[in-house]
Amino acid sequence: MSIESLNAFSMDFFSLKGKTAIVTGGNSGLGQAFAMALAKAGANIFIPSFVKDNGETKEMIEKQGVEVDFMQVGITAEGAPQKIIAACCERFGTVDILVNNAGICKLNKVLDFGRADWDPMIDVNLTAAFELSYEAAKIMIPQKSGKIINICSLFSYLGGQWSPAYSATKHALAGFTKAYCDELGQYNIQVNGIAPGYYATDITLATRSNPETNQRVLDHIPANRWGDTQDLMGAAVFLASPASNYVNGHLLVVDGGYLVR
């Protein structure tokens, strides 16, 4: 260990100034938090989303002194991944960071869970992430740098009732993260994942509003509270920044301790 190496480290290692990040589904929910986090760290943001932005995300991101652009698109549509990467490169010149955040979850009992439930979740949660990463890697390999962050889940570790496809896609996304890391690491591209726990978002409102189910969740979390979206923002900045250049193939769990109980 050299003194020069110790002195070289600074908070600039967490800066994303001049970088460009794609955040799928980045105009709502946890995706909006990821987009805001990277913008606050200095990155320009490109958001492909099925849902058109209502102006809220654009206003918040532009207040950070960076640029943002949107593309209304279904990420599973034929040719969509290629179009997304091409549009980002046309607007910002390159892709430095890809956050595969977009995902869906359908609930049904195992014997009622047919292909109509299964296929869309495989397409959105897994195949779209694979295709976008494939296209982004074509840009990142020649520039000898890049960050791919896959938004996994506690269900990358657990089973989970009523949603076999969700658990299957999140387990697969964790494996995909490690496989891509193994191949792309030689090009100075880091591929990691974030596994959020239970967060206070619109999607979990029904669970939080029911005293019984709300308490059941809290009883499983050592932190004794639901996660706030800001709890995830530091993790996103870390994995997108030079501070994590030697972190590769890792799933960063941000769950208040849920998995240990």
UniProtKB/Swiss-Prot annotation:
Keywords of the record: Oxidoreductase
Binding site for substrate: 153
Binding positions for NADP(+) per the UniProt entry: 22-46
First-level EC class: oxidoreductase
Enzyme Commission no: 1.-.-.-
CDD domains for the chain: Ga5DH-like_SDR_c
Pfam families per the UniProt record, alphabetical: adh_short_C2
Catalytic center residues: 166
GO molecular function annotations of the record: oxidoreductase activity, acting on the CH-OH group of donors, NAD or NADP as acceptor
Presence of keyword Oxidoreductase: yes
InterPro entries per UniProt: NAD(P)-bd_dom_sf, Sc_DH/Rdtase_CS, SDR_fam
Any one GO biological process: DNA damage response
Keyword Signal in annotation: no
Protein family according to the UniProt entry: Belongs to the short-chain dehydrogenases/reductases (SDR) family.
PANTHER family to which the protein is assigned, alphabetical: 2-DEHYDRO-3-DEOXY-D-GLUCONATE 5-DEHYDROGENASE, SHORT-CHAIN DEHYDROGENASES/REDUCTASES FAMILY MEMBER
Protein name in UniProt: Uncharacterized oxidoreductase YgcW
